[in-house]
Design a protein with these regions (language model features):
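Acidic, glycine-rich A-domain
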Residues: 1-91
């Protein structure tokens, strides 16, 4: 058995899968490492939007499967929630 670093595990997973991570923003945590390693696949969900987590995951799956991000956002009942969650991808 050889220990594997978290970053090495992430890289291995990225060879086979589209890897996403949703961070719930509560303040005080440095999330830049997730941005660095996942880029647009790091979703930041403000704590006030946590009740929308399932919808954010569903929207992520739709976009990963080819749906247009702007259409997915526009068709959601509260587009501002998805705009906040996908702000890395919308820059």
């Amino acid at each position: 058995y050889e220990p594997t670093s978290p970053l090495a595990c992430l890289k291995m997973a990225q060879h086979k899968f589209q890897v996403f991570h949703v961070s719930i923003e509560k303040g005080g945590y440095d999330l830049s490492g997730w941005d660095k390693h996942l880029g647009n696949n790091h979703l930041r969900l403000p704590a006030r939007d946590v009740s929308h987590l399932a919808e954010v995951v569903l929207a992520t799956m739709q976009i990963a499967n080819g749906a247009d991000i702007n259409e997915v956002i526009a068709n959601y009942k509260d587009p501002e929630v998805l705009k906040r969650a996908f702000r890395n991808a919308l820059r």
